[in-house]
Amino acid sequence: MAKLTVKDVELKGKKVLVRVDFNVPVKDGVITNDNRITAALPTIKYILEQGGRAILFSHLGRVKEEADKEGKSLAPVAADLAAKLGQDVKFIPGVTRGAELEAAVNALEDGQVLLVENTRFEDVDGKKESKNDPELGKYWASLGDGIFVNDAFGTAHRAHASNVGISANVEKAVAGFLLENEIAYIQEAVENPERPFVAILGGSKVSDKIGVIENLLEKADKVLIGGGMTYTFFKAQGIEIGNSLVEEDKLDVAKALLEKSNGKLILPVDSKEANAFADYTEVKYTEGEAIDPGFLGLDIGPKSIAKFDEALTGAKTVVWNGPMGVFENPDFQAGTIGVMDAIVKQPGVKSIIGGGDSAAAAINLGYADKFSWISTGGGASMELLEGKELPGLAALTEK
């Protein structure tokens, strides 16, 4: 990565601005998944160990109007972070700017940390955070001593005041360890993979993944397709899909992708189908690709798992984005488990999960430690897989 990293700058005695991704699920004031907080710890600890004074910025959820602030404060995150670091985390509820914040920042000593309230509280008045208001970026930059560390891969595909805005107003904008790792794993896998390179794409919509499929058809040796988007590809070939999910307006796109894939695009050959999505009374496997009338496909079937297992044999690089079925329901998680088993058993494989639902599947089903890398960013990893430049990364200082 040709950008400066946190190890390239002198931190001692400096007020260091850090964009982290603490956009974690909070229910009734309790954090239900702290993975993103844990992922940011190496960078935060490094800054504190080097004698820096860390000023952290993050958003939490979407905030469009005053009422949306309810339950969106970073207060539970400040408490959780303090417990993880074993030290006090300064935090002023509801405050994203002003004299009180400035006084707290200026009172910081070496090795101390302050968390600014949810950056999207600034969106209530004209979307200042989300639209990268130049004055806001300049103001937040003024709180520090010219160093900005971006460690929020999850928002690197957005040009917001708290990443791109601050970057434009500091002497040095550098990558944190998490951002550095994310780029190293995902970009390296796509641009310079050890072969065979197999990509696996699931999820419900073809429309979300068109750019990714097109880019990976050029880069990968094989692209396996599962999940709900299977049925748009099936219908495009005239295969019966019953009541399965389909994007009628993407049938031509699916057909075109199949035609230009030169056999690289590998589809399921059977499905696990049910007579309803939720309150079903009958679940069975299809004989072949076709879904029975009145049924909908909710997972790939055993023949497909075997086919994908064979396609993955000998793979040296695997990138996976999107589950094979409705994995949250035990009745429809066999496909996702089967594909994970097929990936992790390959000797010497570099296996990368591109965030979102696939990351949740790996973590919830006990496979997290079996993969080389699990991305913390859904949208950002998708854009990297698509070959796009990420604004948050582009804004960092060149080496």
Curated annotation (Swiss-Prot):
Residues annotated for ATP binding in this entry: 209, 297, 328, 355-358
Disulfide-linked positions: none
Signal peptide per UniProt: none
The reaction(s) this protein catalyses: (2R)-3-phosphoglycerate + ATP = (2R)-3-phospho-glyceroyl phosphate + ADP
Xref: SUPFAM superfamilies: Phosphoglycerate kinase
EC number: 2.7.2.3
GO CC terms: cytosol
Gene3D superfamilies, alphabetized: Phosphoglycerate kinase, N-terminal domain
Record's subcellular location: Cytoplasm
GO biological-process terms attached to the record: gluconeogenesis; glycolytic process
Transferase is among the record's keywords: yes
Summary of subunit composition and partner proteins: Monomer.
PANTHER family linked to this entry: PHOSPHOGLYCERATE KINASE, PHOSPHOGLYCERATE KINASE 1, CHLOROPLASTIC-RELATED
Protein name according to UniProt: Phosphoglycerate kinase
Gene that this sequence comes from: pgk
